[in-house]
């Protein structure tokens, strides 16, 4: 159900991206760099883990309102098992490549989505590759800098879910 809602939201945002051109989602349409702090959820039903990570990103405006984005990240703190707290898991390296449509809500706030491919490794475990999507909100701190919050699904299946709430800042040139 979460995946279907995410797909619908991404589709709706793609359909309304033209509004971003008229409103000017950002004064900076060039290269952007971002860094974020991620609260990761590793769901392995019936249990889950809650590691913490960092994520770095770079994006470039492809068309007004549509960016191409690449992200790299890793876990920085292991997450405890929700049933047996002595068991822990950590996320290893992760990377993703995305198309990132966005639109202005007003002159300071913007809404964005991401849809693409991600590869996520669980330390001392498997690597998981596949479709990835997410939604986010950003706030213009000044002409070049934004604060953002996003929720991204890196892997969704019946046996494993990897998602993260990321809070960060990005800077554009």
What label would you give each PLM region?
Residues 21-68, 72-78, 101, 109, ...:
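Short glycine/proline- and aromatic-enriched beta-strand/turn motifs that initiate or cap beta-hairpins
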Residues 1-30:
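Cleavable N-terminal export/targeting peptides
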Residues 72-89, 120, 147-168:
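Outer-membrane beta-barrel translocator/channel fold
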Residues 29, 48-54, 89-95, 127-133, ...:
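Residues that define the transmembrane beta-barrel architecture of outer-membrane proteins
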Residues 96-139:
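Surface-exposed, polar helix/loop patches in the mature regions of secreted/periplasmic/lumenal proteins
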Residues 60, 101-103, 137-139, 153, ...:
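Residue-level signature of outer-membrane beta-barrel architecture
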Residues 32, 135-139, 146, 161-173:
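Outer-membrane beta-barrel "beta-signal"
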């Amino acid at each position: 159900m979460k995946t279907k809602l995410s797909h619908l939201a991404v589709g709706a945002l793609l359909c309304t991206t033209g509004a971003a051109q008229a409103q000017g989602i950002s004064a900076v349409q060039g290269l952007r760099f971002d860094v974020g702090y991620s609260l990761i959820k590793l769901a392995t039903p019936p249990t889950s883990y809650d590691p913490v990570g960092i994520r770095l990103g770079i994006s470039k405006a492809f068309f007004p309102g549509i960016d191409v984005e690449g992200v790299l990240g890793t876990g920085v703190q292991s997450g405890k098992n929700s049933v047996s707290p002595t068991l822990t898991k950590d996320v290893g390296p992760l990377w993703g490549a995305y198309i990132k449509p966005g639109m202005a809500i007003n002159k300071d706030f913007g809404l964005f989505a991401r849809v693409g491919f991600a590869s996520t490794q669980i330390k001392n475990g498997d690597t998981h590759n596949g479709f990835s999507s997410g939604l986010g909100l950003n706030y213009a701190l000044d002409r070049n800098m934004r604060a953002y919050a996003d929720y991204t699904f890196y892997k969704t299946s019946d046996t494993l879910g990897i998602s993260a709430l990321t809070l960060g800042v990005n800077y554009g040139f």
